[in-house]
Amino acid sequence: EGFRESGLSLEQSKALIQLGVELADKARNDFLTENPDGKAYVAASIGPYGAYLADGSEYRGNYRASPETIREFHTGRIEAIRELAEQFDFWAVETLPSLDEALIVADLLAADPHPAWFSFTLKDEEHIPEGMSLAEVTRALDEIPSVTAIGINCCHPGWVMDMRILSTGCISA
């Protein structure tokens, strides 16, 4: 959507999204050529709908958008990246402010063979911006087979250790 609003066509927008994956894959291959015993992975990054709005709402979660609008926003980007399935290793769904948005993206990725991690912003030591506790978020996402990791980002550094404590007992083995 952001590319489209900048005057690019749908095809140009798709090409730019895919270029990010292609450049990351090339960087990985260059690294592995120079470091044959090394390991390198490419994450296909999916950011929040609020980042497109460019109003800071990715940190608040108050998009005032319908679930259908959020689904449509993520669908096009995911489909563009999915065409390059051989060039990335996992999905990194990052900086989400709400469980609702995470569940929409998880549903879109449900049939995808790549594992996915989901990370959230926090409004305080225990809650994501929409108000749900991190423990509740962890329990909800733990039910989804493709979700392999849950984390936090873009938050106060002191809250990172608290997340480990809060999520203890919420994740299945």
Locations of the language-model features?
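Domain-level signal for soluble alpha/beta catalytic cores
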Residues: 1-173
